[in-house]
Amino acid sequence: MVYYEPGQDRNGAALRRSGHVRWFYIMSNVIDERFMAEALKEAEKSANFDEVPVGAVIVKDGKIIARGHNLREKSNDPTAHAEIVAIRKACKKLKSWRLEGCTIYVTIEPCSMCAGTLLWTRIQRIVYGANDIKGGALGSSYNLFEVKNINHKVEITRGVLENRCAALITSFFRSKR
């Protein structure tokens, strides 16, 4: 498992030597922000249905192949988290349970159920917006991916459009109090 903070590149030394560091930072941030903005649109759909506003999109080869938002209340399904909804759609589209070469963009740090499912799909990369200190399974609460016997390594990028993602979820829960 490899973690990246916003603005940190994935090809570090090679890019620094090539002199293209600044361009890569800008391009990777722009791309991540573009897809996170799409995940935020999905999260807003959840909020419109009085669901916890979490959204996700799965990207392969620069194209969105699946979208999802929370549907737990509407479907009476405790597993209908945004990530799981998007994973099911992506697997169906690819006709495979493996999501190798895919990236998921999700507005909040995945819980243990979603992180475990992402691990088993062999997804390449997870990008999330806001930390979830109560239930996040990628380091905020605990880290599911630090289990020693897991062979699959996932690239994780945190904090993309963090303020917008956090504001959406905070606003939702404030309105419930």
PLM regions and their residue ranges:
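Zinc-dependent deaminase
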Residues: 23-49, 97, 110-177
